Amino acid sequence: MSDDNSIASMAARLREAQASGRTIAPLRDTCPGGDATLAYAIQQINNDLRKTNGERVVGRKIGLTSPAVQKQLGVDQPDFGALFASMAYGDGEPMPLASLIQPKVEAEIALVLERDLTAEKHTFADLISATAYAVAAIEVVDSRIRDWDIRFFDTVADNASSALFVLGSRPVLLRDIDLTACAMTLAQDGEVLSRGNGAACLGNPLNAAAWLADRMVRLGTPLRAGDVVLTGALGPMVAVKAAGTYAAHIDGLGSVRATFTE
């Protein structure tokens, strides 16, 4: 099941799930032979519709970079999705739970670019030169797939299970920090629920960023100055069960908060 009508139908199912707040069965059940190319085609349909409706892409997220998260979801490789301006919230700004379906939070290191990344193969030096600063971030992930019963095909099609994100307010130059050594804690109202470090993100968040930069060049849509790159989770995701504040602290980058309201 890989013709244009089938792809459009699966994309429409995801849009309807988001609009209604009702999850759907895994897309892989509809398309058992679906591969990454097909999944990204589904993602692109919905992202293009958002842009047609006036939404603005402000960067990319990398998913499935932490072995802990890969283990949770039964996958073994990264993926990526688009970040839109409408997904961005300020540090501690209230996020209505009603706009989400089955949200989870994860702590990440975000990069904000000041130069385009257009090389065929990017080095750490390329990334350091092109990055204005790094900052602590919380990504709110969500799935339109029932009970988070996802595999690689499902999450890629679903814009890498993206929802919202929050950037911290303490920018740090990459040359001033060792990202692999950054310890992370993620707590809800003071109770630590997740721990990790920069090395949990493909060994170094810059490995994830280089993977994304290379991939986007191959696709003809390179990362540009001003883009935000969420490099991936530093530890296990935490399910958001009710209203409250989740605070991530990353050594050297400070803290950032995601606050959920009923």
UniProtKB/Swiss-Prot annotation:
Gene Ontology CC terms, in alphabetical order: cytoplasm
Recorded metabolic or biological pathway in which this protein acts: Aromatic compound metabolism; 3-phenylpropanoate degradation
Gene Ontology terms for molecular function: 2-oxopent-4-enoate hydratase activity; manganese ion binding
GO biological process: 3-phenylpropionate catabolic process
EC number(s) from the headed UniProt entry: 4.2.1.80
Main EC class the enzyme belongs to: lyase
Pfam families: FAA_hydrolase
Entry keywords, A to Z: Aromatic hydrocarbons catabolism, Lyase
Catalyses which reaction(s): (S)-4-hydroxy-2-oxopentanoate = (2Z)-2-hydroxypenta-2,4-dienoate + H2O
Protein name: 2-keto-4-pentenoate hydratase
Organism encoding this protein: Burkholderia vietnamiensis (strain G4 / LMG 22486)
